[in-house]
Amino acid sequence: MSLRSSYSVRSSTSQVPVSQMSQMSQMSIKRTTNVPTYRAARSTAAAGQGTRISSASYSGVRSGVGLPSMSSSIHVSATGATGDIMGNEKMAMQNLNDRLASYLRSETLEQANSKLELKIREALEKKGPEVCDYSRFQPIIDDLRRKIFDATSNNARLVLQIDNARLAADDFRVKYDSELSIRQGVEADIAGLRKVIDDTNMNRMNLESEIEALKEELIFLKKNHDNEVMELRNQISHSGVQVDVDAPKGQDLAKIMEEIRSKYEKMALKNQEELKAWHESQITEVQVQVIQNTEALEGARTEVNELRRQIQTLEIELESQRNLKGSLEATLRDTEMRYNMEIESLNAVTMQLEAELTQLRNNIQHQTQEYEALLNLKMKLEAEIATYRRLLDGGDFKLQDALEEQKRVKVMTVTQTLVDGKVVSSSTETKEKKF
C-alpha cells in the first residue's frame, strides 16, 4: 500500500516569517470596515508638476480563523506649488489629521496582525501538523495477507485433491469398463458352454434311445431264434418216417443245429459285447465331456462371483469417491464464498483508507491555499504598514514607495511515496511567484 504525501516549503525575498499550518477549525467572522480615503501631499523637486499616486485596495480574505474585510486607499497628491501648501494652515492641519488617522489605522492593523499571528501560533501549538500514521494498520494488513496466502494454499491443495480424486475416479471407471467387458465375455462363454451342454445332453439322449432300440432288437432276435429252434425241434420230434438204407450214416442234424445255435449265440454275444463296449465308450466320452463342461461351468461361476464381488467393491469405492468429491466441492464453494466475503471486506477497508487519504490530501491542499492567502495578506499588510510608517516618519516619498511592492515567493513542493512506512521515491518542484 503506497501513501503519497505532499507538503510545501515557501521562501520569500522579503523578510516575512513563514509558519506551517495544520487543520484549523473553520470560523466565519465577517466584519466590514469602511476606511475613508487618505491624501498625503508632499513637495517634489519639479515645481508646477502634479503627481497622483494610488495604492492597491485589499479585499477581505476568509480563512480558518477569519479576517475582517478591509478596504483601504491611499491617495497622495502633490502639487508643484510648495509655497501654497506651506502657507495654507487649513491644508496643513488637514494633512496632520490625515497623518494621525493613518497612524491610528496602522496601529490597528498591527494589532490585528499580531492577534492573527497569535491565533495561528496557538492553533499550530494545539493541533500541530496532522500526519496520518498508517503503521497501526500494518499488523492488520500483514494478518490479512497471511490469511489470503493460507487461503490460496488451501485452495490449491483442494484443487490438487480434487484433480487426484478425478483421476482416481477415471481409473476406476476404466477398470470398471474393462471388468464389465470381461464379465460380458465370460457370460458369452457361459452361454456357449450351456449350449454345448444342451447339445451333449441331446446326444446322450439319442444314444440312450438307440441303445434301447438295439436292446429291443436283440430281444426280438433272441425270441425269433428260440421260436425257430422250437419249430425245428417240433418238426424233428413229430417226424415219424424212418428210412433204413444201406447208405453211409449222414450228418447228425441235432449236432448241426447245436453248432448253428452256438454259432448264432457267439455272434449274438459278440454283437452284444461290441454294442456294450461301444455304448460304454460313448457314455465314457459323454461323461468326460460332461465333467469337463461341469468343471468349466464351475470355474466360470466362480469367476463370475469373483467379478461380481469386485464390481460391488468398485461400486462402493466409486460411491465413496463421489461422496468425497461432493464434500470437497462443497468445502471449496464454502471456502470461496468465505474468502470472497473477506476480500470484499478488505476492499471496503481499502476504499475507506483511500477515501481518508483523499480527504487528508484535500485538507492539506485547502490548508495550503489558506496559508498562501494569509501569507499574501500578511505581506500586503506589512507593506501597507511600512508605507504608513514612512509617511508618519516624514521620510522621502518617492513614486516607487507608493506603488505596490513586488515580492517574490518561492514555493517548493516535495512529493514523497511511502510504502510500508518507508520512503521509496521523492521529487521536488520549485515555483516562484511575484506579489
UniProtKB/Swiss-Prot annotation:
SUPFAM superfamilies: Intermediate filament protein, coiled coil region. Pfam families: Filament. Residues 141-232 are annotated as: Coil 1B. PROSITE patterns: IF_ROD_1, IF_ROD_2. Residues 395-435 are annotated as: Tail. The keyword Phosphoprotein applies. The keyword Hydrolase does not apply. InterPro entries: IF_conserved, IF_rod_dom, Keratin_I. Residues 2-88 are annotated as: Head. Transmembrane segments: none annotated. Residues 257-394 are annotated as: Coil 2. Residues 233-256 are annotated as: Linker 12. The record marks 246-247 as: Cleavage. Keywords: Coiled coil, Intermediate filament, Keratin, Phosphoprotein. Residues 89-399 form the IF rod domain. Residues 89-123 are annotated as: Coil 1A. GO terms for cellular component: keratin filament. Residues 124-140 are annotated as: Linker 1. One of its GO terms (biological process) is intermediate filament cytoskeleton organization. Residues 1-28 have a biased composition (Low complexity). Phosphorylated. When phosphorylated, plays a role in filament reorganization. Belongs to the intermediate filament family. PANTHER family: INTERMEDIATE FILAMENT, KERATIN, TYPE I CYTOSKELETAL 18. Heterotetramer of two type I and two type II keratins. Keratin-18 associates with keratin-8. This is Keratin, type I cytoskeletal 18. The lineage of its organism: Eukaryota, Metazoa, Chordata, Craniata, Vertebrata.
